[in-house]
């Protein structure tokens, strides 16, 4: 399955206060030549982009400040998906590092930016899975225990559980908003 939509879809978000998009999604490799084009187009529409590696391979969050509060968003795609749907066209890479490497990147940022609220958007779990994977719950707790403000998950195409852990939100699966629920 490949996913594609018209750039006109972005017009639906023109009145939104703030729009950010993670590109850490296994379907980004359906059209590898379009990843940078998509990121540039989104940025040109004042939409924050995160979840793709920089040209030098580094992982940077999308950062912004609102009402004196700084925010940073990191995106990650479970490497299981990118190993089966790879980018063989160019060197553009979505963030799909092993969890320990990704955690070190995020937690180094947290340490260097103690006043910034850091969130992680995780593309994980299996299609149509109802249950939260124990390793994902453990990883979300690990991130929160070390200073991340919240963890948001997606990919299973159906809502999954959520919890408030140590006063911070974890949403394991958002479900579908713009895809048919039959997927």
Could you say what each language-model-derived stretch is?
Residues 13, 42, 109-112, 143:
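Generic structural signal for hydrophobic
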Residues 48-66:
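A substrate-binding/cap region within the structured catalytic cores of diverse enzymes
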Residues 19-24, 48-52, 71-75, 117-121, ...:
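Structural recognition of the beta-strand scaffold that forms the well-ordered cores
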Residues 3-4, 65-121:
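Binuclear metal-dependent hydrolase catalytic cores centered on His/Asp/Glu-rich metal-binding motifs
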């Amino acid at each position: 399955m490949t996913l594609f939509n018209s750039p006109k879809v972005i017009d639906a978000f023109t009145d939104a206060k703030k729009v950010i998009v993670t590109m850490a999604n296994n379907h980004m490799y359906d059209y590898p030549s379009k990843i940078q084009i998509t990121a540039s187009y989104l940025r040109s529409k004042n939409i924050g982009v995160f979840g793709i590696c920089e040209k030098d391979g580094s992982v940077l969050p999308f950062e912004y400040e609102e009402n004196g509060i700084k925010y940073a968003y990191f995106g990650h795609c479970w490497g299981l998906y990118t190993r089966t749907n790879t980018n063989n066209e160019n060197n553009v890479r979505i963030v799909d590092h092993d969890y320990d490497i990704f955690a070190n990147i995020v937690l180094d940022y947290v340490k260097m930016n103690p006043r910034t609220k850091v969130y992680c958007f995780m593309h994980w779990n299996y299609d149509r899975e109802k249950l939260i994977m124990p390793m994902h719950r453990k990883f979300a707790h690990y991130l929160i225990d070390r200073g991340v403000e919240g963890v948001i998950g997606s990919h299973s195409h159906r809502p999954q559980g959520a919890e408030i852990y140590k006063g911070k939100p974890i949403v394991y699966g958002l479900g579908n908003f713009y895809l048919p629920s039959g997927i």
